[in-house]
Curated annotation (Swiss-Prot):
Membrane-spanning residues: 816-836
SUPFAM superfamilies linked: L domain-like, RNI-like
InterPro entries named among the record's database cross-references: Leu-rich_rpt, Leu-rich_rpt_typical-subtyp, LRR_dom_sf, LRR_N_plant-typ, LRR_R13L4/SHOC2-like, RLP23-like
Subcellular location: Cell membrane
Residues bearing glycans: 73, 109, 141, 165, 233, 275, 282, 342, 347, 477, 503, 574, 613, 706, 746, 754, 774
Protein name according to UniProt: Receptor-like protein 32
Cytoplasmic side: 837-868
Top-level taxon of origin: Eukaryota
S-S bonds: none
Cellular component annotations (GO), alphabetically ordered: plasma membrane
Stored PANTHER family: DISEASE RESISTANCE LIKE PROTEIN, LEUCINE-RICH REPEAT RECEPTOR PROTEIN KINASE EMS1-LIKE-RELATED
Length: 868
């Protein structure tokens, strides 16, 4: 019985002891299993306080993720997105908010820099957001930082000198902002290895304190306004691998000490004002240099023979070098790794023999640019010579004075890119060109070609899948119909045959290209018939202006969901206003000028339209007062916030840029490239009547407004005073009455205005812009008077001023604000408009990422890619 009692009493004792053991024993010490502690409460609270200062810009698109959405009060901050903690202490060590769609204006009291609860941060990454304002000096509180990345934001002001006190930093990226002034002293950051301050507005000379940074490996100063000479003792940076300072105003000679740095692999100093004789000095042996770009400077003299010592060179750009003599290509034969060679615009006095060059031993080169030099090429060669030593992939011969198509190219079966534009080549384009199996890009523009050889179609039949993607043949003398072989180029993305003498209709077989064709330019030909009804689902730009096209706009265009530019000007199209095009969510440019369009301009909400030209048609009727309420791209609702980065339409496409002709400041001007922030509205030379809609004042981003030669009546809306970006205003040749609104005198960008041939009266506004106009701008308005008018029209009659202005003018300001309120009150409509806004301004899809914009790769990202 005793034994039984003992056994039953031991069991509960042993179990309770085991529970106690499990809860108290530190298994981590035995098994080495890490357990993440809960984050510290004061740090969680600090992060939540920080979150309140951020606004998430929605929608958040590809490549961007709203990191702070996972931050919640009832969860462990160590598990939040963008947060890395110490596994033992729970201390927040890393804060990564990059690409998070965050917007905030920083100031001296911003929580991020003032809370001491995050003082042990080692990494702070705010890159690729929409942060603005100035960096406060208290950033030095983060004394443990090793990585600080503020790149690709909108930070302004000077770079705070206190950053130089962050002595533990190894990585600092301030690129892609709006910093101004001189760089502060960074000489105490002895651990720094990577420094990027490119793409700002920094001034002054080369920051000499940087020469103290002995561990520096990557240095980028590009795209600023630095001046003066580069230091002669650049060799102090003995660990430098990557040096970029292109796009500044550096002068003086190229410091030869650069080439004694044994670790240096990349130098880019293009687009400066460096001068003198090109010399490389004592080159380190063996040289590790792989990239050398010193193009677009003011160097003179021959290419130094010592360049042959750069035995690992892969990319060499010496373009725009004033060689003042012949080019000795033998100096490149020792560069066995050379792949890209740019010798364009050398100002050489001799002719480059392409045949001799192709017979040389530059076998590693796959891309060569000789544009802007005198180049000769034997056109008649034997079959035995069809196998040159040199096989090249990319050849650029633009503006080389070539008069016949180089026959030697027919054996270049590895060629992918051929630019032979801006020469004097006449006759027909040879059929064998299209048999080159890897050919992707051909530029034949600005020559004297008359047609394509008949053997072209036979040549294409020999290729299973033609690879051609870009065919540019503009500004030639091509005649006859559009060649049918083009329909067989089923990978074609860009087709430009503009400015030729082609006739006939657009072939229906071009529907074969509906899956790939993005840019079609056939303007300035003699094409007739109707527009194709095929659905080019990838079409982004269609320009068929200045032809003889008839009929109507195909209603199938409503399914061109990718369309951004539609230009049908100067044809014979007879149709009503295509209001249905407003459903195209990406349409930005619409040009219907000089056709036979007629009837009313129906009310339509063109949310994304930035340029519209309806001039020289037969449109009639009135425009309702709220006509422009939802034209968001021309209003501040979709205005780009990046004024410093002037981006053009088609920037992401190297081989094609949209253009448009507009009446601007009284002159017909061609915009060879279209700025993304440029906006214009031209309704001139029609039969429109009634009052000018007061909602015109909502278009605050408008640059050009032309309503001339219509039958508008009533007063000029005072709401036009809201058009803060307006540069050109033409309301001449109407029946307008009343005064010129005084508010127009406050428009500082308004350089041209025309009020002539109306029934205007009263005081002409003051202001510099009005005083700079010609007298003709006010002609045939006998009731106008004022000092501004007296200055531009010497002898005028000034009637007595009226005592009372019409009550309509007194109410206009209130009414335009009513339209603004109405616009804001449109609930779902405005949400839809804002969605389109962000698509246009902040969406960065793959096709938009090459140059783009504000989300271009930073210098250190490019560097990392090279290492991979």
């Amino acid at each position: 019985m005793k034994d039984s009692w003992n056994s039953t009493s031991i069991i509960p004792f042993t179990f309770s002891s085991l529970i106690f053991f499990l809860f108290t024993f530190d298994f981590q010490d035995v098994f080495g299993v890490p357990t993440k502690h809960l984050c510290r409460l004061e740090q969680r609270d600090a992060l939540l306080e920080l979150k309140k200062e951020f606004k998430i810009k929605k929608p958040c698109f590809d490549g961007l993720h709203p990191t702070t959405e996972s931050w919640a009060n009832n969860s462990d901050c160590c598990y939040w997105d963008g947060i890395t903690c110490n596994d033992k202490s729970g201390e927040v060590l890393e804060l990564d908010l990059s690409r998070s769609c965050l917007q905030s204006r920083f100031h001296s009291n911003s929580s991020l820099f003032t809370v001491l609860n995050l003082r042990f941060l080692t990494t702070l990454d705010l890159s690729y957001n929409y942060f603005s304002g100035q960096i406060p000096s208290c950033i030095e509180n983060f004394s443990h930082l090793t990585t600080l990345d503020l790149s690709k934001n909108y930070f302004s002001g000077g770079i705070p000198s206190s950053i130089g006190n962050l002595s533990q930093l190894t990585f600092l990226d301030l690129s892609g902002n709006e910093f101004v002034g001189e760089m502060p002293f960074f000489g105490n950051m002895n651990q720094l290895t990577n420094l990027y301050v490119d793409s700002n507005d920094l001034t002054g000379i080369f920051p000499l304190s940087l020469l103290n940074l002995k561990h520096l490996s990557d240095l980028s100063l590009s795209r600023n306004q630095f001046t003066g000479t580069l230091p002669s003792n650049m060799s102090s940076l003995s660990n430098l691998e990557y040096f970029e300072a292109w796009g500044n105003a550096f002068t003086g000679t190229l410091p030869s000490s650069l080439f004694t740095i044994a670790s240096l692999t990349s130098i880019n100093l293009r687009n400066n004002q460096l001068n003198g004789t090109l010399e490389f000095g004592n080159i380190s042996s063996p040289s590790t240099l792989t990239v050398l770009d010193i193009s677009n400077n003011n160097f003179i003299g021959p290419i130094p023979k010592s360049i042959s010592k750069f035995i690992n060179l892969q990319d060499l750009d010496l373009s725009h070098l004033n060689t003042q003599g012949p080019v000795d290509f033998s100096i490149f034969t020792n560069l066995k790794s050379l792949q890209l060679l740019n010798l364009s615009h050398l100002n050489t006095t001799t002719t480059i023999d392409l045949n001799a060059l192709f017979s040389s031993h530059l076998n590693s080169i796959y891309s060569m640019d000789l544009s802007g030099n005198h180049v000769s090429a034997t056109t008649k060669i034997s079959v035995a010579d069809h196998h040159p030593t040199q096989l090249i992939s990319q050849l650029y011969l633009s503006g080389c004075g070539i008069t016949e198509f180089p026959e030697l190219l027919r054996s270049q079966h590895k060629m992918t890119n051929l630019d032979i534009s801006n020469n004097k080549i006449k006759g027909q384009v040879p059929g064998w060109l299209w048999t080159l199996p890897k050919l992707i890009f051909v530029d034949l523009s600005n020559n004297i070609f008359t047609g394509f050889e008949r053997s072209t179609e036979h040549g294409l039949s020999l290729i299973t899948k033609p690879s051609m993607q870009y065919l540019v043949g503009s500004n030639n003398n091509f005649t006859g119909k559009i060649p049918s072989f083009i329909c067989a180029l089923r990978s074609l993305i860009t087709l430009d045959l503009s400015d030729n003498n082609l006739n006939g209709s657009i072939p229906p077989c071009m529907g074969n290209l509906k899956s790939t064709l993005s840019f079609l330019n056939l303007r300035q030909n003699r094409l007739g018939g109707g527009l194709p009804r095929s659905i080019f689902k990838s079409l982004r730009s269609l320009d068929v202006g200045h032809n003889q096209l008839v009929g109507k706009l195909p209603r199938s265009f409503i399914r061109l969901s990718a369309l951004e530019v539609l230009n049908v000007e100067n044809n014979r199209i007879n149709d009503t206003f295509p209001f249905w095009l407003s459903s195209l969510k990406k349409l930005q440019v619409l040009v219907l000028r000089s056709n036979a369009f007629h009837g009313p301009i129906h009310h339509a909400s063109f949310h994304t339209l930035r340029i519209i030209n309806l001039s020289h048609n037969q449109f009639s009727g009135t425009l309702p007062a709220n006509y422009f309420v939802n034209w968001n791209a021309m209003s501040s609702l979709m205005a780009t916030e990046d004024r410093s980065q002037e981006k053009y339409m088609g920037d992401s496409f190297r081989y094609y840029h949209d253009s448009v002709v507009l009446m601007n400041k009284g002159l017909e001007m061609e915009l060879v490239r279209i700025l993304k922030i440029y906006t214009a509205l031209d309704f001139s030379e029609n039969k429109l009547e009634g009052e000018i809609p007061r909602s015109i004042g909502l278009l605050k981003e408008l640059h050009v407004l032309n309503l001339s030669s219509n039958a508008f009546t009533g007063h000029i809306p005072s709401s036009m005073g809201n058009l803060r970006e307006l540069e050109s205003l033409d309301v001449s040749q109407n029946k307008l009455s009343g005064e010129i609104p005084q508010e127009l005198g406050n428009l500082s960008y308004l350089a041209y205005m025309n009020f002539s041939h109306n029934q205007l009266g009263g005081l002409v506004p003051g202001g510099t812009q009005f005083r700079r106009q010609n007298c003709s701008s006010f002609k045939d308005n006998p009731g106008l008077y004022g000092s501004s008018l007296e200055e531009v029209c010497l002898d005028i009659h000034a009637p007595a001023p009226q005592q009372h202005e019409p009550p309509e003018l007194e109410e206009e300001d209130r009414e335009v604000f009513s339209w603004i309120a109405a616009a804001i009150g449109f609930g779902p409509g405005i949400a839809f408009g804002l969605t389109i806004r962000y698509i246009l301004v902040f969406y960065k899809p793959d096709w938009f990422m090459h140059t783009f914009g504000h989300l271009q790769p930073s210098a250190h990202e490019k560097r990392l890619r090279r290492k991979q």
